[in-house]
């Protein structure tokens, strides 16, 4: 009786497996073949219902599923009428996936797939024939099968150790890159041409596809991130319907990076895309874009690994100020809010970015924030780290910045005068000493009366500080004398 029950259960299981489309890498389903070493993943998207009689007719000409990887004829060796069908068959071959951790395993099949991918790229690039909707759909499915995958964990996730400095880590290089690169090339050749009908293509390059592309930016392989950057930028430019969605999805990636993980390999590439997007913003700037600056871009100065993406971030920030100069006050106050306290390397980056922002700042906006700004610059000028002090002093090499300072010297010089004097008197670095003396001389020539007034105030303040210090020392001396006298009067106190 038990054996009969088990046989029945096995029959049901085999039927369920036969009907389960998730076991196959393409649609219509076909098994991966006799080799157990081949891996076939299910496409990321389901089949779409054909939307026209033409597409219905094309759907009936789909080739039967393939069960093994065998070479197919070249496109030039078949008639024009057979090329669409051959294209679909080649797509089926490319849905097979292999284990690249062992270079010898399935070497023949891997090479067949690579050659097939090359043929597909050449076919799309040559424009030899306009792809039917079925061909476009199946091609996007094949691309999805290959590129959308679980990324390997970072080294610290494997070991459970604290993450090391991202700049010092060796990036993980994707073993299947010989195939992946060609698939990305195919996707790029499909998106870029001007004759690609976006009304048709957006059915397959949809929000789900774009979102999964964005998830791939976490890959450690810089080659893949470079392709992803180019492709996403092209999608943003070509598919206007996706633009708000892409910006919103990027927002979420930045929020998670800032407030949760502080780890993401592709922040620099995403910011590079954003730099181009910001450059194309129309004026007057929408409130949505200003909120993005305040809520996402400025807080990106907070994470520790800012050095990995600071160049791209700085470009985006400056683009905003150049687009709308009234944002300068907001940006400068944002920088001051996230100004590093103990990280000198990060402080040097901030000073460099600050100079670029000031170069695009007008007088009115500068006056709104100059007091807190130069209070921070004064702290940088007197920093014991010579790189920080030197970078702050280099601000006076910028003509536009010097012009802003000259117009407002009555407010600025009293704030920074003490830092300049202390550098000249006691800073250990000769370069800092010399630069401080040059700036002091510049102010002296610019406004002798103001300089004399600041000099007098500084000397009075120093004299007062010296007097306070002497009084403090006298109090301690009198206290010591009182203790000694008490000890002499009552020896029991010390015994």
Swiss-Prot record:
Bias (Polar residues): 49-61
The highest taxon in the source lineage is: Eukaryota
Query: Which molecular function GO terms apply here?
Result: protein phosphatase regulator activity
Q: Where is this region: Disordered?
A: 1-61, 462-495
UniProt feature, compositional bias: Basic residues: 1-13
Q: Where in the cell is it found?
A: Nucleus; Cytoplasm
Q: Does the keyword DNA-binding apply?
A: no
* Cellular component GO terms, alphabetical: cytoplasm; nucleus; protein phosphatase type 2A complex
Query: Could you say which tissues express the protein in this record?
Result: Expressed ubiquitously, higher levels in leaves.
Listed under GO biological process in this entry are:
brassinosteroid mediated signaling pathway; megasporogenesis; meiotic sister chromatid cohesion; microsporogenesis; regulation of phosphorylation
Major subcellular site: nucleus
Gene3D superfamilies with a match to the protein in the record: Leucine-rich Repeat Variant (1.25.10.10)
UniProt KW Glycosyltransferase keyword:
no
Keywords in UniProt for this one?
Brassinosteroid signaling pathway, Cytoplasm, Nucleus
> Which SUPFAM superfamilies does the annotation name?
ARM repeat
Q: What does this protein do?
A: The B regulatory subunit may modulate substrate selectivity and catalytic activity, and may also direct the localization of the catalytic enzyme to a particular subcellular compartment. Required for the formation of the PP2A holoenzyme that positively regulates brassinosteroid signaling by dephosphorylating and activating BZR1.
Q: Which family does it belong to?
A: Belongs to the phosphatase 2A regulatory subunit B56 family.
Q: How does it assemble?
A: PP2A consists of a common heteromeric enzyme, composed of a catalytic subunit (subunits C), a constant regulatory subunit (subunit A), and a variety of regulatory subunits such as subunits B (the R2/B/PR55/B55, R3/B''/PR72/PR130/PR59 and R5/B'/B56 families). Interacts with BZR1. Interacts with BRI1. Interacts with SRK2E/OST1.
Q: By what name is this protein known?
A: Serine/threonine protein phosphatase 2A 57 kDa regulatory subunit B' alpha isoform
Please report the organism this UniProt entry assigns to the protein. Arabidopsis thaliana (Mouse-ear cress)
The uppermost taxa in this organism's lineage are:
Eukaryota, Viridiplantae, Streptophyta, Embryophyta, Tracheophyta
């Amino acid at each position: 009786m038990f054996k009969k029950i088990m046989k029945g259960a096995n029959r049901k299981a085999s039927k369920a497996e036969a009907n389960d489309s998730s076991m196959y890498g393409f649609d219509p389903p076909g098994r991966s073949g006799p080799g157990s070493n081949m891996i076939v993943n299910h496409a990321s998207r389901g089949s779409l219902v054909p939307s026209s009689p033409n597409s219905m007719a094309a759907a009936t000409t789909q080739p039967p599923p393939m069960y093994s990887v065998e070479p197919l004829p070249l496109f030039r060796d078949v008639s024009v009428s057979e090329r669409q069908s051959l294209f679909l068959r080649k797509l089926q071959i490319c849905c097979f996936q292999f284990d690249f951790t062992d270079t010898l395993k399935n070497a023949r099949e891997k090479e067949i797939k690579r050659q097939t991918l090359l043929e597909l790229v050449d076919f799309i690039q040559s424009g030899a024939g306009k792809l039917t909707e079925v061909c476009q759909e199946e091609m996007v499915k094949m691309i999805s099968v290959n590129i959308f995958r679980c990324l390997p964990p970072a080294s610290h996730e494997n070991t459970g150790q604290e993450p090391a400095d991202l700049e010092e880590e060796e990036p993980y290089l994707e073993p299947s890159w010989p195939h992946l690169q060609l698939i990305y090339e195919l996707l790029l050749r499909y998106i870029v041409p001007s004759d690609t009908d976006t009304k048709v293509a957006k059915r397959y390059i949809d929000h789900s596809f774009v979102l999964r592309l964005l998830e791939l930016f976490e890959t450690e392989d810089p080659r893949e991130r470079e392709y992803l950057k180019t492709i996403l930028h092209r999608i943003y430019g070509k598919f206007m319907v996706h633009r708000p969605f892409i910006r919103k999805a990027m927002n979420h990636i930045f929020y998670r990076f800032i407030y949760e993980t502080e780890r993401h390999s592709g922040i620099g590439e995403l910011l590079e895309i954003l730099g181009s997007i910001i450059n194309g913003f129309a004026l007057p700037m929408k409130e949505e874009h200003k909120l993005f600056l305040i809520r996402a871009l400025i807080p990106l100065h907070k994470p520790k690994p800012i050095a990995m993406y600071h160049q791209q971030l700085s470009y985006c920030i400056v683009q905003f100020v150049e687009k709308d100069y009234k944002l300068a006050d907001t940006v400068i106050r944002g920088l001051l809010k996230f100004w590093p306290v103990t990280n000198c390397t990060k402080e040097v980056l901030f000073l460099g970015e600050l100079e670029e922002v000031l170069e695009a700042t007008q007088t009115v906006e500068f006056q709104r924030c100059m007091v807190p700004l130069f209070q921070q610059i004064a702290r940088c000028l007197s920093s014991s780290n010579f790189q920080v002090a030197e970078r702050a002093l280099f601000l006076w090499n910028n003509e536009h910045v010097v012009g802003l300072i000259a117009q407002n010297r009555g407010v600025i010089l009293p704030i920074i005068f003490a830092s300049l004097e202390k550098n000249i008197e006691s800073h250990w670095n000769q370069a800092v000493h010399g630069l401080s003396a040059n700036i002091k001389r510049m102010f002296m020539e610019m406004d002798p009366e103001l300089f004399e007034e600041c000099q007098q105030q500084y000397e009075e303040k120093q004299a007062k500080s010296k007097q306070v210090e002497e009084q403090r020392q006298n109090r301690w001396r009198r206290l010591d004398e009182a203790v000694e006298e008490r000890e002499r009067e009552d020896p029991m106190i010390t015994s």
